Amino acid sequence: MKKFIKMMLCLGLMFILCSCGSDEVELNYTTKKVGDKTVYTIKTKLYVASSEETNLVMINVKDYGIMVAELYPDKAPITVENFKKLVSKNFYSGLIFHRVINGFVIQTGDPNGDGTGGSEKTIKGEFEANGIKNNISHVRGVLSMARRGSNPETEATLNSASSQFYIVQEDATYLDGKYAGFGKLVSGYNVLDKIASVKTNMNDKPLTDIVIENVRFVKYYEE
């Protein structure tokens, strides 16, 4: 009987230890030092930070991992220029994903954390409804600018994008021509899906803050 009790206690302890282990954060990247550089590996792609502006940005989300997006200045020059300026100022560091809808988008870029804020500047909306050609379709992984909407649309709402942007989780091509797509993920789709799956309140805000540690310019690294 004593042996049985001891065995059950051991099994219980093992279960507790295993349960604790499962709560550890599993990130989607590894790092290694090469000289004075830190090389980030995400699957088969290698990235390193860039001191200059590039068309690749790394979005580091605390406890979730890294997403890397390619920007398209040839298709949305005004939007990309504005985004790059904000990245250069570390504007996005410490901001949260304030709007998360599984099967649709994850949204960030608001210093107020509730969808009401932005930067000091608004930009011209680069999309067809505003008279500007932009053939970036809102498919999975696309980055696009959030803006105020109205019915009917006004010049003020069409040109109200500032700093808030969203990443499309599942194809939403009905947004084409109405919102300014400006980039697309090249790495980190598992992070996108992980964020999209969190529990939210009735306003689509995650119950626990999902914080951006930083957004930085990177470039591909070749060994």
Task: List each language-model region with its residue ranges.
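Sec-dependent N-terminal signal peptides of Gram-positive bacterial secreted proteins and lipoproteins
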Residues: 2-23
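Cyclophilin-like peptidyl-prolyl cis-trans isomerases
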Residues: 20-223
